[in-house]
A protein has these predicted regions:
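Interaction interfaces in information-processing and related assembly proteins
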Residues: 1-162
Length: 162
């Protein structure tokens, strides 16, 4: 199955859904990621594609998640053209399961999520917010809803679900 992105719009609402299995599998293989790093990288890559779906043709987005956990930094870039790439600083992290699930939040730790939008202008626009759980979907939702930066006008209220 190939990766794909579906866009739906009605007056006042935009929705995006994506399948990124092949892109994430390629990144996980290239970086030799253990399961927790694979989950964090895949979620971040998918989130960057979802945000990039709103961009103009020549624009791109970078999501940078910097936490104090053992995973370190997770970064993903995506363009409006659907091309995505990502990396994780420490791909060989292994933590015990938390409530039967991968502890991505524990691997990322406490820190910041930053989103940079490159528009072709001289200076990119960057906004950031504190990580809420480190599980990425909640952190992205908090970023989209948080009015605490000078570039909050670049944000559209939204939520992310896995």
């Amino acid at each position: 199955m190939k990766d794909y992105l579906i866009k739906a719009t009605v007056p006042g609402v935009r929705a995006f859904c994506t399948v990124t299995t092949e892109s994430v599998a390629e990144a996980v293989t290239r970086h030799d990621c253990y399961p927790i790093a694979a989950a964090a990288l895949g979620r971040t890559m998918t989130a960057s594609l979802l945000l990039a779906a709103n961009l103009k043709t020549d624009e791109c987005i970078t999501i940078r998640i910097c936490g104090n956990g053992p995973l370190g930094e997770v970064v993903a870039d995506a363009g409006a053209n659907g091309i995505v790439r990502g990396t994780v600083r420490n791909p060989h992290i292994d933590l015990p399961l938390k409530n039967g699930k991968l502890d991505v939040g524990g691997a990322i730790g406490i820190g910041l999520i930053s989103v940079t939008r490159f528009t072709g202008m001289k200076q990119p626009f960057t906004g950031s917010s504190h990580l809420v759980t480190g599980e990425i979907a909640e952190d992205l939702t908090n970023y989209l809803a948080w009015p605490g930066t000078s570039h909050s006008s670049n944000r559209r209220p939204g939520t992310a679900r896995w």
